[in-house]
A protein has these predicted regions:
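Transmembrane beta-barrel strands of outer-membrane/channel proteins
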Residues: 1, 31, 47-51, 89-93, ...
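Long, well-ordered mid-to-C-terminal structural blocks that present hydrophobic/aromatic surfaces
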Residues: 25-100
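Membrane-embedded beta-strand positions in outer-membrane beta-barrel channels/transporters
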Residues: 30-34, 73-77, 113-115, 144, ...
């Protein structure tokens, strides 16, 4: 498989003395497993774990601007169906097993998400509300709302809102001054 997020490797120096970077999507091997258990009463408990052998991370201190490390990703989640709403609580953990000085990714990256997805008005209105954060919440959080409305069979309207909080050096906090509002319309055929 290939990494979805690029690693930036140093390609060389341009004539005007700027460093030239190349986006790379390195290959890696991955093994993993998942388990989901129906706990009854509309509750599902799920878990996943994955091991990546050569995960590449941008590192300006290394030759060609990148390092590699084995990485483990794990997830524990609980889903609850309440009428027309699917409520999910999820804890994810990502850990570089051979973290090196200069890597632009933290050795350990936890992520907590709480989401609710629902349908209303005979499935014409769909809502998704999300709170995502890396502890502590005041340092790194995202509030997101996604709404789609289909007033007639051939028209789909959308509204998405992202509000970021936190410190500039954190995953969501780096966008704290760039909240987003997106409006869309689509013709369905």
């Amino acid at each position: 498989a290939r990494q979805q997020d690029p690693v930036y490797a140093v390609e060389g120096i341009a004539d005007d003395q700027r460093v030239v970077l190349e986006r790379q999507f390195p290959r890696y091997s991955m093994g993993g497993a998942g388990l989901a258990i129906d706990a009854g009463h509309s509750i599902v408990v799920r878990s996943e774990v994955a091991y990546f052998d050569r995960w590449h991370v941008t590192n300006p201190y290394r030759n060609h601007g990148s390092s590699q490390s084995p990485m483990v990703k794990s997830l524990l989640g609980v889903d609850y169906l309440l009428r027309n709403w699917l409520i999910s609580v999820q804890w994810q953990e990502q850990q570089l097993l051979d973290w090196q000085q200069g890597m632009v990714q933290d050795k350990r990256e936890p992520l907590f998400t709480l989401s609710a997805e629902g349908t209303h008005l005979r499935d014409r209105l769909k809502s998704r509300l999300v709170l995502a954060m890396s502890p502590p919440a005041k340092d790194d959080a995202l509030l997101q709302g996604i709404f789609t409305y289909t007033p007639v069979d051939w028209l789909k309207l959308g509204l998405e809102v992202d509000v970021f909080f936190g410190k500039e050096d954190r995953t969501f906090g780096q966008y704290s001054q760039r909240d987003q509002l997106r409006v869309s319309a689509g013709y369905l055929f």
